[in-house]
Amino acid sequence: MNQVNFLNLDKNILIITSGGDAPGMNASLISLIHRLMNNNFNVFIGIEGLLGLYNNLIEPIKDKRVFDVYFNEQGTVIKTSRFIKLDINDKKTQIIKDNLLSHNIQKIIILGGQGSMQAGLVLTKMGFEVFGILHTIDNDFSETQMCIGALSAASFNQKLLKCLNYTAKAHCAFNLVELMGRECSWLVNNSVGKLKPILMLTNQDNKYTVDEVIDLIKDKINSIKEYDPLIIVQELIYDQKWYELLVKTFEQKLHKSLRITILNYLQRGAPVSDFDLQLAKDSANVLVDFIVNQNDIKNTNNMYVVINKFDNKLEVIKFNK
Protein backbone atom coordinates (compact mmCIF):
# COMPACT_ATOMS: atom_id res chain seq x y z
CA MET A 1 0.00 0.00 0.00
CA ASN A 2 1.07 3.59 -0.53
CA GLN A 3 1.79 5.66 2.56
CA VAL A 4 -1.16 7.84 3.55
CA ASN A 5 -0.94 10.58 6.17
CA PHE A 6 -4.17 11.62 7.87
CA LEU A 7 -4.20 15.01 9.57
CA ASN A 8 -6.70 14.28 12.35
CA LEU A 9 -4.52 12.91 15.17
CA ASP A 10 -7.52 12.04 17.33
CA LYS A 11 -8.89 9.73 14.65
CA ASN A 12 -5.63 8.01 13.66
CA ILE A 13 -4.87 4.77 15.48
CA LEU A 14 -2.33 2.01 14.90
CA ILE A 15 -2.54 -1.68 15.81
CA ILE A 16 0.42 -4.03 16.21
CA THR A 17 0.86 -7.62 17.33
CA SER A 18 4.03 -7.87 19.39
CA GLY A 19 6.34 -10.45 20.94
CA GLY A 20 5.41 -14.12 21.01
CA ASP A 21 2.32 -14.92 18.98
CA ALA A 22 -0.74 -16.34 20.72
CA PRO A 23 -3.90 -17.97 19.33
CA GLY A 24 -6.60 -15.35 18.92
CA MET A 25 -4.45 -12.43 17.78
CA ASN A 26 -6.11 -12.39 14.36
CA ALA A 27 -9.56 -12.40 15.92
CA SER A 28 -8.65 -9.39 18.08
CA LEU A 29 -7.06 -7.56 15.16
CA ILE A 30 -10.04 -8.04 12.86
CA SER A 31 -12.56 -7.18 15.56
CA LEU A 32 -10.65 -3.99 16.36
CA ILE A 33 -10.45 -2.95 12.71
CA HIS A 34 -14.20 -3.35 12.23
CA ARG A 35 -15.17 -1.62 15.47
CA LEU A 36 -12.72 1.26 14.98
CA MET A 37 -13.64 1.93 11.36
CA ASN A 38 -17.33 1.76 12.24
CA ASN A 39 -16.52 4.59 14.67
CA ASN A 40 -14.81 6.64 11.93
CA PHE A 41 -11.21 5.97 12.98
CA ASN A 42 -8.38 5.90 10.46
CA VAL A 43 -6.77 2.53 11.21
CA PHE A 44 -3.12 1.76 10.56
CA ILE A 45 -1.25 -1.48 11.10
CA GLY A 46 2.39 -2.01 11.97
CA ILE A 47 3.90 -5.00 10.17
CA GLU A 48 6.19 -7.21 12.31
CA GLY A 49 5.44 -5.57 15.64
CA LEU A 50 7.92 -3.15 17.21
CA LEU A 51 10.56 -4.12 14.67
CA GLY A 52 8.17 -3.00 11.97
CA LEU A 53 7.64 0.34 13.68
CA TYR A 54 11.41 0.78 13.78
CA ASN A 55 11.60 -0.04 10.05
CA ASN A 56 8.61 2.21 9.30
CA LEU A 57 6.47 -0.69 8.08
CA ILE A 58 3.27 1.22 8.76
CA GLU A 59 0.29 0.93 6.43
CA PRO A 60 -3.27 2.29 6.46
CA ILE A 61 -6.28 -0.02 6.28
CA LYS A 62 -8.58 0.96 3.42
CA ASP A 63 -11.05 -1.93 3.60
CA LYS A 64 -12.20 -3.15 7.00
CA ARG A 65 -12.82 -6.62 5.54
CA VAL A 66 -9.25 -7.04 4.27
CA PHE A 67 -8.27 -9.65 6.89
CA ASP A 68 -11.68 -11.21 7.63
CA VAL A 69 -10.74 -14.59 6.18
CA TYR A 70 -8.10 -14.99 8.93
CA PHE A 71 -10.49 -14.49 11.88
CA ASN A 72 -10.37 -18.12 13.07
CA GLU A 73 -6.72 -18.65 12.17
CA GLN A 74 -3.87 -18.91 14.68
CA GLY A 75 -0.75 -16.79 14.37
CA THR A 76 -0.97 -13.17 13.25
CA VAL A 77 -1.55 -12.03 9.68
CA ILE A 78 0.30 -8.75 10.30
CA LYS A 79 3.31 -10.64 11.69
CA THR A 80 5.19 -10.12 14.92
CA SER A 81 8.78 -10.04 16.17
CA ARG A 82 11.09 -9.86 19.14
CA PHE A 83 12.70 -6.47 19.64
CA ILE A 84 14.96 -4.66 22.07
CA LYS A 85 13.60 -3.42 25.38
CA LEU A 86 12.36 0.09 24.66
CA ASP A 87 14.00 3.02 26.44
CA ILE A 88 13.14 6.68 25.92
CA ASN A 89 16.86 7.49 25.71
CA ASP A 90 17.60 4.76 23.17
CA LYS A 91 18.16 5.74 19.54
CA LYS A 92 16.02 2.91 18.14
CA THR A 93 13.13 3.88 20.40
CA GLN A 94 13.41 7.48 19.20
CA ILE A 95 13.26 6.24 15.60
CA ILE A 96 10.01 4.43 16.42
CA LYS A 97 8.63 7.69 17.81
CA ASP A 98 9.66 9.62 14.70
CA ASN A 99 8.14 7.03 12.38
CA LEU A 100 4.82 7.09 14.22
CA LEU A 101 4.67 10.88 14.18
CA SER A 102 5.49 10.92 10.46
CA HIS A 103 2.18 9.12 9.94
CA ASN A 104 0.38 11.47 12.35
CA ILE A 105 -0.24 8.57 14.71
CA GLN A 106 -0.81 9.35 18.38
CA LYS A 107 -2.89 6.34 19.47
CA ILE A 108 -1.53 2.78 19.55
CA ILE A 109 -3.13 -0.57 20.39
CA ILE A 110 -0.74 -3.39 21.28
CA LEU A 111 -1.74 -7.05 21.22
CA GLY A 112 0.82 -9.04 23.21
CA GLY A 113 2.15 -10.21 26.54
CA GLN A 114 4.26 -8.90 29.42
CA GLY A 115 7.15 -7.49 27.40
CA SER A 116 4.84 -5.85 24.89
CA MET A 117 2.84 -4.12 27.62
CA GLN A 118 6.07 -2.81 29.14
CA ALA A 119 7.04 -1.46 25.72
CA GLY A 120 3.67 0.26 25.53
CA LEU A 121 4.32 1.92 28.87
CA VAL A 122 7.55 3.39 27.51
CA LEU A 123 5.65 4.77 24.52
CA THR A 124 3.20 6.53 26.86
CA LYS A 125 6.17 8.30 28.44
CA MET A 126 7.01 9.58 24.96
CA GLY A 127 3.59 11.19 24.64
CA PHE A 128 1.58 8.46 22.92
CA GLU A 129 -1.82 7.16 23.99
CA VAL A 130 -1.33 3.41 24.33
CA PHE A 131 -3.86 0.63 24.88
CA GLY A 132 -3.41 -3.11 25.19
CA ILE A 133 -5.23 -6.40 24.90
CA LEU A 134 -3.41 -9.23 26.66
CA HIS A 135 -2.38 -12.14 24.42
CA THR A 136 -0.07 -14.79 25.87
CA ILE A 137 -0.23 -18.54 26.28
CA ASP A 138 1.58 -18.15 29.63
CA ASN A 139 -1.46 -16.50 31.27
CA ASP A 140 0.93 -14.69 33.60
CA PHE A 141 -0.90 -11.42 34.30
CA SER A 142 -2.09 -11.29 37.90
CA GLU A 143 -4.57 -8.53 37.06
CA THR A 144 -6.66 -10.75 34.78
CA GLN A 145 -8.21 -14.18 34.92
CA MET A 146 -7.55 -15.23 31.33
CA CYS A 147 -5.20 -13.90 28.66
CA ILE A 148 -6.25 -14.54 25.08
CA GLY A 149 -4.52 -17.64 23.72
CA ALA A 150 -3.87 -19.41 27.02
CA LEU A 151 -6.89 -21.70 26.95
CA SER A 152 -6.25 -22.58 23.28
CA ALA A 153 -2.69 -23.64 24.12
CA ALA A 154 -3.74 -25.62 27.20
CA SER A 155 -6.49 -27.45 25.30
CA PHE A 156 -4.10 -28.30 22.47
CA ASN A 157 -1.48 -29.51 24.94
CA GLN A 158 -4.02 -31.87 26.48
CA LYS A 159 -4.45 -33.52 23.08
CA LEU A 160 -0.71 -33.72 22.47
CA LEU A 161 -0.01 -35.17 25.91
CA LYS A 162 -2.74 -37.75 25.41
CA CYS A 163 -1.04 -38.86 22.17
CA LEU A 164 2.38 -39.03 23.82
CA ASN A 165 0.87 -41.03 26.67
CA TYR A 166 -0.50 -43.65 24.28
CA THR A 167 2.81 -44.19 22.51
CA ALA A 168 4.82 -44.25 25.76
CA LYS A 169 2.54 -46.96 27.14
CA ALA A 170 2.81 -48.93 23.91
CA HIS A 171 6.59 -49.16 24.37
CA CYS A 172 6.59 -49.56 28.17
CA ALA A 173 8.52 -46.29 28.21
CA PHE A 174 8.31 -42.95 29.95
CA ASN A 175 8.10 -39.55 28.27
CA LEU A 176 9.35 -36.29 29.75
CA VAL A 177 7.46 -33.41 28.15
CA GLU A 178 8.59 -29.81 28.51
CA LEU A 179 5.86 -27.19 28.25
CA MET A 180 6.05 -23.41 28.00
CA GLY A 181 4.88 -20.96 30.65
CA ARG A 182 7.99 -18.89 31.36
CA GLU A 183 7.81 -17.96 35.04
CA CYS A 184 4.15 -18.95 35.50
CA SER A 185 2.98 -22.52 36.07
CA TRP A 186 -0.58 -21.94 34.80
CA LEU A 187 -0.04 -23.51 31.38
CA VAL A 188 1.61 -26.62 32.81
CA ASN A 189 -1.09 -27.14 35.42
CA ASN A 190 -3.91 -26.67 32.91
CA SER A 191 -2.41 -28.82 30.15
CA VAL A 192 -2.73 -32.11 32.00
CA GLY A 193 -6.49 -32.53 31.79
CA LYS A 194 -7.59 -35.98 32.99
CA LEU A 195 -4.12 -37.50 32.70
CA LYS A 196 -2.24 -38.65 35.80
CA PRO A 197 1.45 -37.88 35.19
CA ILE A 198 3.80 -39.73 37.49
CA LEU A 199 5.59 -36.44 38.15
CA MET A 200 5.13 -32.73 37.47
CA LEU A 201 7.99 -30.26 37.90
CA THR A 202 7.23 -26.53 37.94
CA ASN A 203 8.97 -23.46 39.30
CA GLN A 204 6.76 -23.82 42.37
CA ASP A 205 8.77 -26.94 43.30
CA ASN A 206 12.33 -27.37 44.46
CA LYS A 207 14.88 -27.68 41.69
CA TYR A 208 15.87 -31.33 41.85
CA THR A 209 19.02 -33.18 40.95
CA VAL A 210 18.76 -36.12 38.56
CA ASP A 211 19.14 -38.60 41.42
CA GLU A 212 16.40 -36.87 43.40
CA VAL A 213 14.01 -37.17 40.46
CA ILE A 214 14.85 -40.85 40.08
CA ASP A 215 14.08 -41.38 43.77
CA LEU A 216 10.78 -39.51 43.47
CA ILE A 217 9.73 -41.68 40.54
CA LYS A 218 10.78 -44.87 42.32
CA ASP A 219 8.63 -43.93 45.29
CA LYS A 220 5.64 -43.14 43.11
CA ILE A 221 5.94 -46.36 41.09
CA ASN A 222 5.86 -48.29 44.37
CA SER A 223 3.08 -46.28 46.00
CA ILE A 224 0.66 -45.31 43.22
CA LYS A 225 -1.61 -47.91 41.64
CA GLU A 226 -2.56 -45.85 38.60
CA TYR A 227 -0.37 -43.34 36.81
CA ASP A 228 0.50 -42.24 33.30
CA PRO A 229 4.16 -42.61 32.25
CA LEU A 230 4.57 -38.88 31.74
CA ILE A 231 6.89 -36.43 33.46
CA ILE A 232 5.61 -32.90 32.82
CA VAL A 233 8.19 -30.13 33.18
CA GLN A 234 7.86 -26.35 32.99
CA GLU A 235 10.36 -24.64 30.69
CA LEU A 236 13.40 -22.66 31.86
CA ILE A 237 14.08 -24.88 34.87
CA TYR A 238 16.30 -27.65 33.49
CA ASP A 239 18.68 -27.59 30.54
CA GLN A 240 19.58 -30.07 27.81
CA LYS A 241 22.52 -31.54 29.74
CA TRP A 242 20.25 -32.26 32.71
CA TYR A 243 17.76 -34.00 30.42
CA GLU A 244 20.49 -36.10 28.80
CA LEU A 245 21.82 -37.19 32.19
CA LEU A 246 18.29 -38.03 33.34
CA VAL A 247 17.76 -40.28 30.29
CA LYS A 248 20.99 -42.13 30.97
CA THR A 249 20.34 -42.50 34.71
CA PHE A 250 16.73 -43.52 34.08
CA GLU A 251 17.85 -46.51 32.02
CA GLN A 252 20.58 -47.45 34.50
CA LYS A 253 18.54 -47.28 37.69
CA LEU A 254 14.96 -47.88 36.58
CA HIS A 255 15.68 -50.05 33.53
CA LYS A 256 13.15 -48.05 31.56
CA SER A 257 13.43 -45.96 28.43
CA LEU A 258 12.86 -42.23 28.84
CA ARG A 259 12.00 -40.04 25.87
CA ILE A 260 12.34 -36.26 25.89
CA THR A 261 9.73 -34.18 24.04
CA ILE A 262 9.92 -30.38 24.01
CA LEU A 263 6.64 -29.05 22.63
CA ASN A 264 8.00 -25.53 22.13
CA TYR A 265 6.27 -23.61 19.31
CA LEU A 266 3.60 -26.25 18.77
CA GLN A 267 1.81 -24.57 21.66
CA ARG A 268 1.82 -21.14 20.03
CA GLY A 269 0.32 -22.58 16.85
CA ALA A 270 -2.59 -24.19 18.68
CA PRO A 271 -6.03 -23.99 17.02
CA VAL A 272 -7.98 -21.06 18.43
CA SER A 273 -10.64 -22.15 20.92
CA ASP A 274 -14.19 -20.80 20.78
CA PHE A 275 -13.55 -19.23 24.19
CA ASP A 276 -10.56 -17.25 22.91
CA LEU A 277 -12.38 -16.18 19.74
CA GLN A 278 -15.22 -14.76 21.81
CA LEU A 279 -12.86 -13.21 24.37
CA ALA A 280 -10.92 -11.53 21.55
CA LYS A 281 -14.07 -10.10 19.99
CA ASP A 282 -15.51 -8.92 23.31
CA SER A 283 -12.19 -7.39 24.43
CA ALA A 284 -11.92 -5.45 21.18
CA ASN A 285 -15.43 -4.07 21.56
CA VAL A 286 -14.86 -3.04 25.18
CA LEU A 287 -11.57 -1.33 24.35
CA VAL A 288 -12.93 0.63 21.39
CA ASP A 289 -15.93 1.77 23.42
CA PHE A 290 -13.49 2.96 26.09
CA ILE A 291 -11.39 4.86 23.55
CA VAL A 292 -14.45 6.47 21.98
CA ASN A 293 -15.93 7.57 25.29
CA GLN A 294 -12.74 8.70 27.05
CA ASN A 295 -11.42 11.92 25.58
CA ASP A 296 -9.45 13.08 28.63
CA ILE A 297 -6.72 10.44 28.79
CA LYS A 298 -4.03 12.01 26.65
CA ASN A 299 -0.42 11.90 27.80
CA THR A 300 -1.11 10.61 31.30
CA ASN A 301 1.88 8.24 31.39
CA ASN A 302 -0.64 5.45 31.89
CA MET A 303 -1.34 2.59 29.56
CA TYR A 304 -4.88 1.21 29.44
CA VAL A 305 -5.38 -2.55 29.25
CA VAL A 306 -8.46 -4.76 28.95
CA ILE A 307 -8.78 -7.36 31.70
CA ASN A 308 -11.39 -9.89 32.79
CA LYS A 309 -12.18 -10.58 36.43
CA PHE A 310 -13.20 -13.90 37.93
CA ASP A 311 -16.81 -13.26 36.94
CA ASN A 312 -15.53 -12.90 33.34
CA LYS A 313 -16.65 -9.27 33.24
CA LEU A 314 -14.40 -7.21 30.99
CA GLU A 315 -13.10 -3.81 32.01
CA VAL A 316 -10.31 -1.40 31.13
CA ILE A 317 -7.73 -0.58 33.80
CA LYS A 318 -4.65 1.59 34.07
CA PHE A 319 -1.42 -0.31 33.54
CA ASN A 320 1.45 1.73 34.95
CA LYS A 321 3.98 -0.66 36.44
Curated annotation (Swiss-Prot):
SUPFAM superfamilies: Phosphofructokinase (SSF53784)
Positions annotated to bind ATP: 20, 82-83
Catalytic residues, chain numbering: 138 (proton acceptor)
UniProt GO MF annotations: 6-phosphofructokinase activity; AMP binding; ATP binding; fructose-6-phosphate binding; identical protein binding; metal ion binding; monosaccharide binding
Domain of life: Bacteria
Gene3D superfamilies for the chain: 3.40.50.450, Phosphofructokinase domain
Catalytic activity line of the entry: beta-D-fructose 6-phosphate + ATP = beta-D-fructose 1,6-bisphosphate + ADP + H(+)
One example of a Gene Ontology biological process annotation: fructose 6-phosphate metabolic process
Cellular location(s): Cytoplasm
Cofactor(s) demanded: Mg(2+)
GO terms under cellular component: 6-phosphofructokinase complex
Pathway listed: Carbohydrate degradation; glycolysis; D-glyceraldehyde 3-phosphate and glycerone phosphate from D-glucose: step 3/4
Binding, substrate: 136-138, 180-182, 235, 259, 265-268
InterPro entries: ATP_PFK, ATP_PFK_prok-type, Phosphofructokinase_dom, PKF_sf
Keywords, ordered alphabetically: ATP-binding, Cytoplasm, Glycolysis, Kinase, Magnesium, Metal-binding, Nucleotide-binding, Transferase
EC number(s) reported in the record: 2.7.1.11
Function, as annotated: Catalyzes the phosphorylation of D-fructose 6-phosphate to fructose 1,6-bisphosphate by ATP, the first committing step of glycolysis.
Family listed: Belongs to the phosphofructokinase type A (PFKA) family.
PANTHER family in the record: ATP-DEPENDENT 6-PHOSPHOFRUCTOKINASE, PHOSPHOFRUCTOKINASE
Subunit organization: Homotetramer.
Name of this protein: Probable ATP-dependent 6-phosphofructokinase
